[in-house]
């Protein structure tokens, strides 16, 4: 069976991506990153998703992005209740570049030619490393910078959610049997994974379920 490395944050998008990769016949190797995020509930969720969806292996890599800083997700910066103009303070500098690079390294080691990530450019917070241009550019980099790209069969970077609305992602996940109840999307989730209900991630998630007409299994502290 062909192998793929899938970035797994513990959120609803990455859970849906695992299911889509499996539907395409890939044996999924899930990679999560402990990058110094302020809460660990998303990594707990990643472990639940990996177990529930039967991945071949789930690796957690430590990278201390708190030492670089610059984000409300790693620093003592207040997470806003809603997105504003421009790139928000919840953007983590170079996060997707770093995570995809780690996935790329693991892919070479295990002989996988495919990387999957859950970036989205429709219902998203405006992060520059979620755009289609970024995904295409990283695939070019992957094939220039690796032995597998230069001497092997080449590497492909898949972003199957990039042009889907949040509602479409919910529908696809439900179709594939994803248990969204074990996922965590909130920027301010507590230790038990309860979502705050009013950050940008919570708003997008709640709207996705509402627009899809599917009950939202998320445990919210308060939903505004």
From Swiss-Prot:
InterPro entries: QueC, Rossmann-like_a/b/a_fold. The gene is queC. Gene3D superfamilies: HUPs (3.40.50.620). Pathway: Purine metabolism; 7-cyano-7-deazaguanine biosynthesis. Zn(2+) binds at residues 186, 196, 199, 202. CDD domains: QueC-like. ATP binds at residues 8-18. The keyword Metal-binding applies. It is an enzyme of class 6 (ligase). Its EC number is 6.3.4.20. One of its GO terms (molecular function) is ATP binding. This is 7-cyano-7-deazaguanine synthase. It comes from the Bacteria. One of its GO terms (biological process) is queuosine biosynthetic process. It holds the Pfam family QueC. It catalyses: 7-carboxy-7-deazaguanine + NH4(+) + ATP = 7-cyano-7-deazaguanine + ADP + phosphate + H2O + H(+). Binds 1 zinc ion per subunit.
